[in-house]
UniProtKB/Swiss-Prot annotation:
Swiss-Prot/TrEMBL keywords: Chaperone, Cytoplasm, GTP-binding, Nickel insertion, Nucleotide-binding
Recorded family membership: Belongs to the SIMIBI class G3E GTPase family. UreG subfamily.
Organism: Yersinia pestis
UniProt name for this protein: Urease accessory protein UreG
The protein's role, per its UniProt record: Facilitates the functional incorporation of the urease nickel metallocenter. This process requires GTP hydrolysis, probably effectuated by UreG.
Amino acid sequence: MTDKSTARKKITRIGIGGPVGSGKTAIIEVITPILIKRGIKPLIITNDIVTTEDAKQVKRTLKGILDEEKILGVETGACPHTAVREDPSMNIAAVEEMEERFPESDLIMIESGGDNLTLTFSPALADFYIYVIDVAEGEKIPRKNGPGLVQADILVINKIDLAPYVGASLDVMESDTKVVRGNRPYILTNCKTGQGIEELVDMIMRDFLFTHVQPEGEQA
């Protein structure tokens, strides 16, 4: 029989993947303060191949918002998708270390290194995953399919403010996304202005944390 006094709650693990420069780190940086404001206790793990630069960046950005000890960089030394799918042992060890140190946490975000459209997360590592693409990669990106983009629990189409500068139609990108993803959710975001970010947090809380999202204007 399990001793309830020592039983540890399940901390939800969310993978965040996508190509280099799509805004994975920026997404983490903008959703973290909102999650904290809503009472969620997050942890963050970032992946880089030969550095821990993303972790350093996140620590600088979230200084005074999230304790630095709750942000961990993993230097994988390997292909990004290998470290989160084929052999996620380094990341699993990092996750277990963080869960052991901060058992009161609700959520751990695991950012992969930048990779191509085939990147997915091993279910041994992540319970859910978000895939981030950006408009500057080209209007045709959703049409290219790829398991990462198609199978993600949430697809984020980021940097929508750049659409007019790169000749991309957001209407076309949305239409193509609906074709390749069916009913799977997606959202358009702009990390600089905050467009779509609150809604993304709503989706995370509702679909990943199974937490009631209070409609705007509703009294607690």
